[in-house]
């Protein structure tokens, strides 16, 4: 396959074995590659997009391939997902909607472009938008921020400040980093702290991914049912 020749997608036997341990110490590329791919592809496709991001399916598909290649570092964490993760996902959705005001003008522009397209094209775009938002993005972002950044910050600070203080510093710093890659900075910071707490509670990346996915799923439902397109 073509992706086998792209280094970021290549998984060596050593990385596959490291993935069974699901730590970034020996499988760093698996944690950071999916988000790097999403950001890189968005920068490239953004150049060829107009006011409406019609190339989002390319963005989502590339991210999905990268996530699939990194599956060994997170798939075992879904065997025992906590109820807390689901609850945090729901609460974070409510906070996001409360903190981010709906933009009528942006929604109107979005709807005009979407409804002007052929029905099949709009349907395909919406399908990829939902899959990207609910599946690909949560996994890619949680691998990079909680699985890699928070893990390493806590590990680095712990010898100097103790485990509890290190965890707090890591959650806060990672929350800031998470916020800076989102347009709604304040809401994203709150979400980042929430997902960081869920991750640190049991040290299970799957919990953070589920919480994030639940939030994004509820946002997607909210957007589609009420046509509040500005949240996308």
Regions found by a protein language model. Give the residues of each.
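Specific transmembrane helices
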Residues: 2-12, 23-138, 217-232
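Transmembrane helix-loop-helix hairpins at the membrane interface
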Residues: 1, 121-232
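Membrane-interfacial, low-structure loops and terminal tails that flank and connect transmembrane helices
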Residues: 7-27, 151-162
């Amino acid at each position: 396959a073509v992706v086998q020749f792209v280094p970021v997608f290549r998984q060596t036997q050593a990385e596959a074995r490291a993935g069974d341990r699901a730590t970034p110490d020996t499988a760093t590329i698996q944690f950071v590659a999916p988000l790097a791919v999403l950001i890189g592809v968005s920068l490239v496709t953004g150049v060829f997009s107009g006011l409406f991001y019609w190339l989002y399916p390319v963005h989502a598909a590339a991210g999905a391939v990268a996530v699939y290649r990194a599956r060994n570092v997170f798939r075992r964490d879904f065997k025992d997902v906590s109820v807390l993760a689901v609850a945090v996902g729901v609460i974070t959705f409510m906070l996001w909607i409360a903190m981010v005001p709906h933009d009528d003008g942006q929604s109107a522009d979005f709807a005009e472009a979407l409804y002007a397209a052929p029905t099949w094209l709009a349907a395909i775009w919406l399908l990829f938008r939902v899959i990207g938002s609910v599946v690909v993005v949560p996994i890619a972002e949680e691998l990079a921020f909680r699985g890699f950044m928070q893990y390493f910050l806590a590990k680095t600070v712990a010898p100097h400040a103790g485990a509890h203080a290190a965890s707090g510093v890591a959650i806060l710093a990672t929350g800031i980093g998470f916020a800076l890659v989102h347009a709604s900075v304040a809401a994203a910071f709150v979400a980042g702290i929430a997902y960081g707490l869920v991750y640190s509670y049991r040290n299970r990346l799957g919990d953070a991914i589920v919480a994030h996915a639940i939030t994004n799923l509820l946002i997607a439902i909210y957007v589609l049912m009420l046509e509040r397109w500005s949240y996308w």
